[in-house]
């Protein structure tokens, strides 16, 4: 391995996102808006760029139009400097089928890797919210001598069936002894039986070894063609898999509160909870860390505006994120996230909610513990999140935790 290896980054952005329905009804999961002005894809791309990795391929598949458009508009680099972020849709180069899994997605685009000829491939998912310096992970990968390294983070043992579970070699703490993808039961860590070391879905691989593993997987009969389910266990079985402890990752400008923050936002509850993490007085995830910025399209929007200051008609927002272009006109917003161009009219009330772009809340309408997709309109006196049975009767999604989701372009008229 050379001292300054050539790096190619691959972002796996082809997931269908069925658990986030109806937010993924018309868009790919990585294109789902997050945090007011961002999309989920902005987080892994920002991490890669901030790490100094600017040759990036984004593998897309389902409903990718808005994702492709966002990447082409926001993530533009000068090719003169050899930098690029390129969306690559499913090519069907090896057969008339979609990607069969994350490993198959990489195998089907192996020609792109061959053209670049990197020494190392960095592979990341597109549906997590976090900050990470991948350079630190790559350096450990090189020093350990591993062919394949998995980023790991501690998670509650009761969630083991949602993650790849890493068992570390006690004699070599940077190496993986065993890797199981989403086991129904498992044992906890030696120092904390209530926790597991879970895979974050981020990998670093030596290119030659990765090619060999993908080729074997493509021919295997009993495989799901999955990076976590098949490729990681393959390297672990050969004693060639390393583990990188995410807790050791140091980010400029991070605080004790948001150090090693990582959230899977693959379900409505996880997506909602991650938004609530943003708006605390001391947020669990700090969007305002300019030493490691999260990039997105800035747009030509005017500042947010709050109007009406009467005793019974006060336009205001508390404990909330309010994006550019928002007008709060005599309404009340509390503990919520408002995306650009939202309108809150007089005597309306928004509490514990997430509103996407262009939502309009008319007079005396009320929204509680809800996610409203783009361009939803609530007419005067209408409600969302107040009466669960009424929400279900209108065809809205209501989670077991009481989060109501209203699909894009819906007019709510009680």
Curated annotation (Swiss-Prot):
A GO BP annotation: glycogen biosynthetic process
Catalytic reaction equation(s): alpha-D-glucose 1-phosphate + ATP + H(+) = ADP-alpha-D-glucose + diphosphate
Gene3D superfamilies given in the database record: Hexapeptide repeat proteins, Spore Coat Polysaccharide Biosynthesis Protein SpsA, Chain A
Gene Ontology molecular-function annotations: ATP binding; glucose-1-phosphate adenylyltransferase activity
Keywords: ATP-binding, Carbohydrate metabolism, Glycogen biosynthesis, Glycogen metabolism, Nucleotide-binding, Nucleotidyltransferase, Transferase
Top enzyme class: transferase
Record bears the keyword Oxidoreductase: no
Highest taxon in the source lineage: Bacteria
Binding site for alpha-D-glucose 1-phosphate: 99, 164, 181-182, 199
Pathway field: Glycan biosynthesis; glycogen biosynthesis
Documented EC number(s): 2.7.7.27
Key word Magnesium present: no
Known role: Involved in the biosynthesis of ADP-glucose, a building block required for the elongation reactions to produce glycogen. Catalyzes the reaction between ATP and alpha-D-glucose 1-phosphate (G1P) to produce pyrophosphate and ADP-Glc.
Family: Belongs to the bacterial/plant glucose-1-phosphate adenylyltransferase family.
Quaternary structure annotation from Swiss-Prot or TrEMBL: Homotetramer.
HAMAP family in alphabetical order: GlgC
Protein's UniProt name: Glucose-1-phosphate adenylyltransferase
